C-alpha cells in the first residue's frame, strides 16, 4: 500500500510516535536512537558528526516541548509530509516541524525531518 492512500487519521497515528521519539532523543542528544527509524537513504545522507554538533550546540534541538499541534498533511508521490507546530521548553515562540514518511521494505520510515 502507498502511504498516500491512508486517511489523515491513519497517517497521524503513524507519525505521532515517530515524531515523539525524534523529540525525545533530540532532547537527550542520542543520535543513534534519534536516527533509528530513518530510511536508508536519509541515514546515509546525514553525517553523524554534524548531527552530534547540532545536538551539542543547538538550544532548540535539546529543548523541544513534547506537546505538538498537527497542522496538516501533504501527499506527494510515495511520501507524505506531516507538518507540526513545535514549541521549545526554553525559547519563546513556535517553530514549524516537518516529518516526511514513506514505506521502505514494508515498514514506515522517516525520509526527512526538520524544524524551521
Give the ranges of each region predicted by the language model.
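Surface-exposed, charged secondary-structure patches
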Residues: 52-103, 112-116
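Boundary/linker segments of alpha-helical solenoid repeat arrays
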Residues: 46-50
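Short, well-ordered alpha-helical segments enriched in acidic and aromatic residues
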Residues: 27-41
Amino acid at each position: 500500500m502507498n502511504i498516500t492512500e491512508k486517511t489523515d487519521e491513519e497517517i497521524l497515528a503513524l507519525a505521532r510516535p515517530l515524531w515523539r521519539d525524534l523529540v525525545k532523543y533530540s532532547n537527550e542528544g542520542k543520535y543513534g536512537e534519534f536516527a533509528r527509524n530513518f530510511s536508508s537513504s536519509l541515514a546515509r545522507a546525514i553525517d553523524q558528526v554534524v548531527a552530534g554538533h547540532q545536538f551539542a550546540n543547538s538550544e532548540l534541538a535539546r529543548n523541544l516541548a513534547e506537546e505538538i499541534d498537527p497542522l496538516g498533511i501533504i501527499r506527494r508521490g510515495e511520501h507524505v509530509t506531516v507538518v507540526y507546530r513545535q514549541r521549545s521548553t526554553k525559547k519563546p515562540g513556535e517553530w514549524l516541524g516537518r516529518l516526511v514518511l514513506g514505506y521502505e521494505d514494508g515498514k514506515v520510515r522517516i525520509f526527512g525531518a526538520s524544524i524551521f
